[in-house]
């Protein structure tokens, strides 16, 4: 039996889809395409150069760059040389990068012109003094100036083009060694260490193996029934676990063609280039996250509104009609509804919807959604205009796909059906399996479950029990076996683009620096900003009222807001937490979280999902229109009940 490894996937693709385009990156001459066979050849050549640089078996290679062909080649090269890839998020702050590189014991660090300054600005924080920096771009004036600005010797940069030449020259010497490494690779060997969530000081490194990627890629293909040789523009960064598996590795199984957004000049340029790149790539499908689909919807609506009330009316009536016609996707309304809505739908389809689809290219058929929960209204909207979003669910620890909707099995408001080969159950707090329709923790088992957390046996044991991965997500299986994900059990914030972060350290910092705030639960469930629920120390608040001579509840509310940021003035917390995770709005809760109201458990920890459920209306206030005004009004009501200004 052939080993189920990344190598076997690339070997097969290099033969079956030899001359078909695999990776396409834009340059000054247009789109530069690399075929499947060329990708394998270039990867082995670069691997030979890595070995010449001193890379040894199980050595780590960190990658911090925007998506491009050489990013993918570099990961394959690391594997061919016997190493392990450590893909890093391009969204990391400069001060967040060193921990991940140091913790993973990286020997090589692959970066781009766009990420160079992020790295060399904190060069003294990297522990490996022999760490080699490899640049995926050609020498430029920008690179020279950045090195000069930070006192970094440009001679210490190694350019990938030079390494390709070294690899070609040393290929004969290293060819047998590379073949031996590939031959001896086991299914349970680690391919990547992906750092996810956690506070600045303690993110966890998720170890994913050859078998993890092999099984999840093949299961996704089998479940989705993906066609061969279709194309996509990969808008998501390649460090994103969803893009990593569904993009890089699923492409090997079915000969998919990947185009990368033209990010020359940085992130702002990348955003500007997406519309043109969408047309040029002629994508059949796109991988997306709710933040992206939400932005597209807003742009559509703004564009339609600008055309006047007549067109806007046709559009709105067409959307409403299509939503009624589509039902939930799984079961459609009857003939009466279809007949009643057909006129408004057809008018909007002919005049508007077909043109909206062309924005994504002439061949677009569907989106595959992941990374965060997708609001059902977004699903209804895209289905209405003829580009359904087939929402899935997963997490990096599961490589990441656990379930997905497909063109053949689709129900809006759900995350689809569990992939072939994965066992899924819903459990209560004591590990008992719950019945259909009953909410509990989503627990899974399969070849896609991670090997564990790097250098963190305790966290691994807490997450994987008897082979079952405890996701920390709450959900249930409905009567048709569709998985419905309803929220988090674990204490993780999730931004609108699916990025995750642990709130505990921020919460502790706020409580420890404020005399008034007794308890705080920071909240972000796929939103643009972070908010908080707080309970107050009544005596401390009364003291503040007297000491500060506070004469209005609006003034008191402002003081509480200032109390929330007191921690940032302390040296130990200066620039420690990324701004997006610090609450920008809050709601005062009258009653403390306690064991009596079941919002605190027996170990005195907050039961976050219960707090969220109980105060969902207060949380929603902070994300409503005119949220600051509405939240202030509600806070004043509570403060009036809690304390007196007399």
Residue map of PLM features:
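AMP-dependent adenylate-forming
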Residues: 9-34, 588-593
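Conserved pre-ATP/AMP-binding loop-to-beta segment of ANL
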Residues: 18-21, 157-195, 202, 225-231
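Conserved AMP-binding/adenylate-forming core of the ANL superfamily
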Residues: 23-68, 72, 76, 93-98, ...
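Conserved AMP-binding A3 loop
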Residues: 33-36, 191-217
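Structural core segment of the AMP-binding/adenylate-forming
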Residues: 53, 80-166
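Conserved C-terminal "lid"/linker of ANL adenylate-forming enzymes
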Residues: 157, 493, 518-523, 528, ...
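Conserved AMP-binding/adenylation subdomain of ANL enzymes
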Residues: 214-231, 238-353, 363
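Conserved ATP-binding/catalytic segment of the ANL
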Residues: 418, 422, 432-437, 443-495
């Amino acid at each position: 039996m052939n080993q189920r490894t990344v190598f076997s996937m690339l070997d097969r693709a290099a033969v079956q889809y030899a001359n078909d385009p695999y990776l396409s990156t834009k340059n000054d001459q247009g789109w530069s395409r690399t075929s499947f066979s060329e990708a394998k050849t270039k990867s082995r050549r670069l691997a030979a150069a890595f070995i010449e640089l001193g890379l040894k078996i199980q050595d780590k290679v960190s990658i911090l760059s925007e998506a491009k062909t050489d990013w993918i080649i570099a990961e394959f090269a690391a594997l061919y040389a016997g190493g392990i890839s450590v893909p890093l998020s391009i969204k990391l702050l400069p001060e967040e990068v060193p921990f991940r590189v140091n913790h993973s014991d990286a020997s090589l660090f692959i970066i781009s012109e766009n990420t160079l300054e992020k790295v060399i600005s904190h060069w003294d924080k990297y522990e490996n003094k022999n760490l080699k920096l490899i640049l995926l771009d050609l020498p430029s004036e920008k690179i020279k100036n950045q090195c000069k600005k930070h006192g970094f010797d440009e001679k210490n940069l190694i350019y990938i083009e030079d390494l390709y030449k070294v690899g070609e020259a040393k290929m004969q010497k290293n060819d047998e060694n590379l073949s031996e490494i590939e031959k001896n690779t086991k299914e349970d060997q680690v391919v990547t260490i992906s750092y996810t969530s956690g506070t600045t000081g303690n993110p966890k490194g998720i170890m994913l193996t050859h078998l993890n990627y092999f099984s999840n890629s093949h299961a996704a293909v089998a479940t989705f029934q993906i066609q061969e040789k279709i194309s996509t523009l990969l808008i998501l960064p390649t460090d994103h676990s969803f893009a990593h598996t569904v993009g890089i590795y699923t492409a090997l199984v079915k000969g998919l063609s990947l185009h990368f957004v033209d990010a020359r000049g940085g992130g702002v340029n990348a955003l500007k280039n997406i519309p043109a790149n969408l047309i040029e790539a002629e994508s059949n499908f796109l991988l997306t996250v709710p933040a992206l689909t939400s932005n597209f919807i807003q742009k559509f609506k703004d564009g339609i509104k600008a055309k006047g009330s007549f067109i806007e009316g046709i559009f709105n009536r067409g959307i409403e009609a299509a939503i009624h016609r589509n039902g939930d996707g799984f079961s459609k309304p009857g003939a009466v509804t279809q007949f009643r809505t057909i006129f408004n739908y057809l008018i909007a389809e002919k005049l508007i919807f077909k043109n909206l689809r062309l924005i994504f290219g002439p061949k677009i058929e569907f989106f595959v959604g992941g990374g965060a929960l997708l609001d059902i209204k977004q699903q209804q909207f895209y289905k209405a205009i003829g580009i359904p979003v087939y929402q899935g669910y997963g997490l990096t620890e599961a490589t990441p796909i656990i379930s997905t909707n497909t063109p053949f099995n689709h129900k809006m408001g759900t995350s689809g059906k569990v992939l072939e080969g994965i066992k899924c159950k819903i459990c209560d707090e004591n590990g008992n399996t719950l019945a259909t329709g009953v909410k509990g923790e989503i627990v899974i088992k399969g070849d896609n479950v991670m090997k564990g957390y790097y250098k963190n046996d305790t966290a691994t044991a807490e997450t994987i029990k008897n082979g079952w991965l405890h996701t920390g997500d709450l959900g249930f299986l409905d009567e048709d076996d569709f998985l419905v994900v309803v929220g988090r059990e674990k204490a993780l914030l999730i931004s609108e683009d699916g990025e995750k972060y642990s709130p505990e350290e921020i919460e502790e910092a706020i409580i420890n620096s404020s005399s008034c705030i007794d308890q705080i639960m920071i909240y972000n469930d796929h939103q643009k900003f972070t908010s908080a629920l707080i309970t107050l120390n009544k005596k401390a608040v009364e003291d503040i009222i007297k000491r500060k001579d506070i004469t209005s509840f609006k003034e008191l509310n402002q003081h509480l807001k200032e109390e929330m940021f007191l921690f940032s003035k302390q040296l130990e917390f200066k620039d420690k937490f990324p701004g997006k995770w610090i609450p920008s709005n809050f709601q005062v809760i009258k009653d403390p979280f306690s064991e009596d109201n079941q919002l605190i458990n027996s170990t005195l920890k907050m039961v976050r999902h219960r707090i969220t459920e109980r105060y969902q209306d207060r949380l929603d206030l902070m994300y409503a229109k005119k949220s600051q005004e509405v939240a202030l009004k509600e806070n004043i009501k509570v403060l009036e009940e809690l304390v007196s200004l007399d």
